[in-house]
Amino acid sequence: MGTTRAPWHTPPRSSPMTIAFDAPAADALARDSELLSAVLHEVLVEQNGAALAREVRWLHEAAAELRAGDPAADRVLVERVAALPDEQVEPVIRACALQLQLANIAEERERVRRRREYDRTGARQRESLLEAAELLRRDGADLAAAVRALHVELVLTAHPTEATRKSVLDHQLHIARMLDGLDDPRIGATDRRRLLADLRESLTLWWLTDEVRRVRPKVEDEVRRNLFFFTHTLHEAVPQVLDELERTFGVRVGGRALTFGSWAGSDMDGHPEVGAEMLSRTLSLHRTAALRLLRGGVDALAARFSHSRRHVTVSPALEASLARDEAELPTAEVLRRVHREWEPLRTKLGFVAHRLSNMLDPVAREPGYADPQELRADLWLVLDSLGSPNVARGAIRRLLRQVEVFGFHVAALDVRQSAAVVQEAVAALLPGYRQAGEEEQAQLLAEAIAEDRRGLDRRPEGAAGELLRVLDTVAIAREAFGPAAVPVMVISMVHAPSDVLAALWLTRRAGARLRLVPLFETLADLEGAPATMATLYGTPVYRDSLRAEGDRQTIMLGYSDSGKDSGFVSSQWALHVAQERLAAQAAERELELELFHGRGGSPSRGGGRTHRAILAQPRGSLSGRIRITEQGETVSARYGDPELAVRSLEQTLSAVLLASAREQPPVPGAWRAEMERMSERSRAIYRALVYEDPDFPRFFAQVTPIEELTALNIGSRPSKRSAGGVEALRAIPWVFAWTQSRVLLPSWYGAGAALAEGPLELQREMAARWPFFQSILSSLEMALYKADLGVGERYLRLVEPELAERFWPRIEREYAQVVGRVLEITGASALLDDAPALQRRLSHRNPWVDPLSHLQVELLARARAGREDAREPLLETITGIAAGLRNTG
């Protein structure tokens, strides 16, 4: 039986040089896919021989025939996988995985192409700043007020299951640039040959690079990985998107509209390698990266700004500044230039560069800048003397934007530690604390905070002692680098007011006045969050601390653990209700509330379309301010290319502007009651399977590669908080394991009966008019479409028959019920019917992902039988499937 071929199928139909680069724009994705496939085919033949390329083709064709409905192809696929010679197993896996990653690159170039076309024609792109401005004008909103209130902070995390090495990211970025060059219709045959040769070279180097790390990454590797995105793409993208915001809304946009944070190197929670030394090292790496970028930007300006005194008017302030620089910087290279007297702007920029260099030199005797404001003041002196508005809006404005947003630290570091460790530190230091109950502990802490003493009499051992050393480092760093470098302490797993008051006391005693952010993660803690905050707001010393922060309270909401606790639907509703109550509570007290969303990549951890998720926030919970985590697994997809980064940033900013400035109607009581019912029912179904059946942990361990994941060197953090089963497992590897087996159970299980038992017409009304419910259905559709229980069933050969017979039928029934009900509500004939392009892309991936899944099952069987040679190729399948589904945890 025939099947529709994916545009990146093997073997290629033509050689790279014969591909039509002048094809219509509509065919550009197919052209890029064909080109990448053709070049990979050449690389495979050159590096490993034609036999490997043939084997890859046969596996792909068998998987495609099976997808097209040919049952005989199933046997062929199974037999070919089992019969693969040992020496071909790993190369075949790598070839399939590389095809999938090349598909990702081709699709990303298509996104860039579409954005450019909208920009060229002036047409309005969905989820753009232009669309947001038009919608707000139509509603009569105050655009200037909306922009002035805007403050979006994106916090990059180090993801425990991020599967892409930085070396691979470099190759991917280079290949994307080659495709971009080939897209230019003006290039001739010589340039095309050169670009194709570069493309072939990059792909060969990638093929010869280990996809899987041979050793577990150090924390510093994760710090450098985050810095890669800041220095390679975001540094370029941010000025563009802020300029676009200013141009579209006609309002001056300051640097506070968009800022960045990072957890890599400062997140201590469950991470023994992160401590005072690592924090200090991270601060140094951030500062060095920021200063080098700024120095490079200033050097580039100096090379261009050759203005003569005869053609520009030098302001008295700039003249005075030059005189001061000459006195303070006698060794500056610019003083040796012949033309310095006649080129004042270039001379000034030379002094600026020298000051930045001094800041990079630990033994420099001449001054640098005390803070970014001093640098901005010098750049404004140059700007004021330019005279030309065209130049003023160009390179120097971009540099000023970069100084505003990234400062001397690139991204603010959040210190994070669990409430349990914070409490342990206090118990070791405060007499009588350990024996007291919650109310008495809160009272003891309030009294101790009111004393306002500095210094600590003694130091506990272990994690508690390391926390105190970190706080000492923070106090020093804030003095040296400014408060913006380390502004926040996130207290994870907050259960009670004393958890936050304990952190307040510790930070005060250590002299580190950090903004405290309680993180509510479990379902019970989310439900109890308003009561916890009410107690804190009623505690005078805590209220005084908020007053010192401008009456601003930041609260973080954890999507991961609540989803693992209660399932997707119940978790989403609990988060929604918590936000409503916390927002109302803050408004009553005239506090400015900033919600910090700990979203992940998968739907079960709050992932999905960022724009839609922001629009689904409850009424009154957004007032222009929001913090959002960008998990390691999604960062490369959203920010791996400067133009993709611009698009991702504008989608986030436009959603926050719309959600903040547009009036939202109250949610009808019937809708709330239905969501409450669905939440309770889905939670009961989910927990009955995951937590209440004592045999489920054994089934989970056998039907997914969870045990093998712990051997994969893709994150520095341990996958478990403590010894134990599902309860002890972190939410991220829990989701990753189910993604690998293609079941994606955490993203949909429990929703079937919960939806099916409710009134269909009411649910259709909710789907038509309520953004929150639309977001739930959208996330369910995506997860259900990516899930494949036919492939997941293959993993049952690894499971004890009795366990398979008990659990698999329950999973199949629930899946069928969820799919059926979602289609009934939406009125569609198939999942993702309203997104045919996405449907096609995901469907075209399956014939490459399926062989990887079959190979993974075979290799898991071998590994569990004790075959050591199965380990390396098994880990390759894990990274390949993650790339194919574009999901880890």
Residue ranges and their predicted role:
Residues V274-A303, R509-A684:
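Catalytic or ion-translocation cores adjacent to nucleophile or general acid/base/metal-coordination motifs
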Residues E341-T347, F351-H354, N358, F408-L501, ...:
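Active-site cores of enzymes that catalyze phosphoryl transfer or operate on phosphate-rich substrates
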Residues V43, W58, P71, E108, ...:
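Carbohydrate-active enzymes and regulators
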Residues E153-H159, T164-R165, L169-A176, A189-D210, ...:
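Structured alpha-helical segments in the cores of large, soluble enzyme domains
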Residues P12-A446, A463-E466, L514, G607, ...:
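Often metal-dependent polyanion-binding catalytic scaffolds in large enzymes
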Residues F700-G889:
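C-terminal accessory/interaction regions of large nucleic acid-associated machines
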